[in-house]
Design a protein with these regions (language model features):
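Flexible "arm" and connector segments at domain edges
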Residues: 1-48, 52-81
Length: 81
């Protein structure tokens, strides 16, 4: 699924760089916060999905594997106790 999202993003926004994607991520996080403040579950789900898409697109821009990063972070957090 991640590769499909990265491919879609490259086709849809061919001139976007990592900073463009980062700015979009910040925008989507703000929209998630607004949805959470209104406590509307459907909007929260949609905005959380948008945040995830931005994270996947950003990982593609940075040539990093998001799944591997999550696994590494989870392992680090488990070791903290």
């Amino acid at each position: 699924m991640n590769n499909k999202i990265i491919d879609w993003h490259i086709c849809k926004f061919p001139k976007a760089d990592k900073w463009d994607v980062y700015r979009k991520l910040l925008e989507e996080v703000g929209e998630l916060g607004e949805a959470m403040a209104r406590n509307i579950n459907k909007n929260i789900e949609l905005e959380l999905g948008d945040v995830m898409i931005c994270l996947i697109a950003l990982s593609g821009q940075l040539h990093m594997n998001l799944e591997d990063m999550v696994k590494q972070s989870h392992k680090k957090n488990l070791m903290r106790g």
